[in-house]
């Protein structure tokens, strides 16, 4: 009969051949990849879509095959008017979720603003956004990104935002879809205004989409840290890279240390907007930088 001591010696023998700490480091790396998922935003390929080089329905396959990414974010413009076409959206769902991918959110850019000063415009905007809530629900997305960038007097803007976005959030109840504000012009670039918006709405279907590069004159690091508690996803925007692989505008190591230490868990999505290199190359560079930064923040090696 094998003694307990002999069993333990045999069972742990392979570990003795590994560098000290490597087993625990691997556990840490695996845990990091369970906590965070890398996503890709379709706007990364907006020039390809506009030129016809990339068809909207082929985008999920490109993300998986060329980038090794299976968490997908969409942009409203490539849908045209087909976001309410159940067959078309069903085909897109089949090409994504059918391949084991996860649809995350849709960036919705339409003319009428949810926080417009004109009540009739707000009402039109709510009605237009309802179709995007339905589209996101059919795709299995957890959110749509909305714009609240009419600006003007902060308090009046908050009131108008609560009227328009509040009505949309009420519509979204039970859909599994949130309507999230991105810093994208007007008062929405002010993190304190965004926090006031969340407090004013106080709605389970409302949230935020922090963006590394969209807070205007505000300190981007402090702004992201403030807004992370309401984040449904995080937008890791990259524009250009230095020779050492770091991003020219944002210190990714510093920013992703903030994301890591905040307790946030979920998708960190690439949005590459550079013009000097191919979007595939830009997305891959951003992906590498995200993981490298998160690993450094966690003190693990991938």
Annotate each PLM feature.
Residues 71-72, 162-258:
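Acidic/histidine-rich catalytic cores of soluble enzymes
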Residues 136-154, 175, 180-184:
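Active-site groove signature of glycoside hydrolases
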Residues 2-138, 156, 173, 203, ...:
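N-terminal pre-domain/capping segments
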Residues 266-273:
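Conserved active-site loop/cleft motifs that coordinate metal ions or position small ligands
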Residues 151-165:
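Active-site cleft segment of glycoside hydrolase catalytic domains centered on the general acid/base Glu
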Residues 40, 103-105, 145, 181, ...:
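Hydrophobic residues in well-ordered beta-strands that form the structural core
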Residues 101, 177, 262-266:
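A short helix->loop->beta-strand "cap" motif at the edges of active sites that frequently abuts
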Residues 69, 136, 141, 231, ...:
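A structural motif
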């Amino acid at each position: 009969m094998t003694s307990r001591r002999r069993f333990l010696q045999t069972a742990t023998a392979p570990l003795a051949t590994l560098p000290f700490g490597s087993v625990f480091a691997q556990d840490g790396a695996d845990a990091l990849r369970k906590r965070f998922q890398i996503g890709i935003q379709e706007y990364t390929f907006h020039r390809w879509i506009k030129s016809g080089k990339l068809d909207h329905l082929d985008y999920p396959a490109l993300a998986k095959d060329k980038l090794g990414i299976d968490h997908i974010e969409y942009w409203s413009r490539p849908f045209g008017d087909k976001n309410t076409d159940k067959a078309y959206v069903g085909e897109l769902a089949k090409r994504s979720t059918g391949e084991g991918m996860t649809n995350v959110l849709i960036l919705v850019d339409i003319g009428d603003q949810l926080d417009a000063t004109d009540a009739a415009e707000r009402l039109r905007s709510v009605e237009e956004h309802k179709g995007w809530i339905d589209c996101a629900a059919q795709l299995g997305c957890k959110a749509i990104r909305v714009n609240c960038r009419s600006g003007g007097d902060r308090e009046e803007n908050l009131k108008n935002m609560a009227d328009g976005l509040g009505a949309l959030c009420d519509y979204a109840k039970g859909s599994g879809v949130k309507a999230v504000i991105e810093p994208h012009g007007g008062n929405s670039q002010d993190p304190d205004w965004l926090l006031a918006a969340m407090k004013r709405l106080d709605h389970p279907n409302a949230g935020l989409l922090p963006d590394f590069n969209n807070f205007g004159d505000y300190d981007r690091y402090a702004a992201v840290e403030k807004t992370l508690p309401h984040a449904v996803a995080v937008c890791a925007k990259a524009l250009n890279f230095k020779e050492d692989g770091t991003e020219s505008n944002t210190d990714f190591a510093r920013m992703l240390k903030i994301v890591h230490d905040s307790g946030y868990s979920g998708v960190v999505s690439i949005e590459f907007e550079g013009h000097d290199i191919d979007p595939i190359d830009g997305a891959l560079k951003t992906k590498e930088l995200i993981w490298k930064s998160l690993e450094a923040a966690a003190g693990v090696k991938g």
